Amino acid sequence: MLSEQRYHIILDLLEKNAIVKTHALCQEMGTTRETIRRDLMALEEKGLLKRIRGGAMKADASESDG
């Protein structure tokens, strides 16, 4: 699976759930934790999500907490 495909899946899951867990993403996409970690880092750099321990949350959800 290409990284852009994984990004799309991650962002779709974040639209449905405020938080996604790394373990669940690994199972969903059949990839390693390291691959998911790199994907989450790339999406965070683009401002599309906020990484948290064990997963990620919507970027806008983290802004409204402050």
Q: Model-predicted segments: where are they?
A:
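HTH-adjacent hinge/linker in prokaryotic transcriptional regulators
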Residues: 2-23, 27-28, 34, 40-66
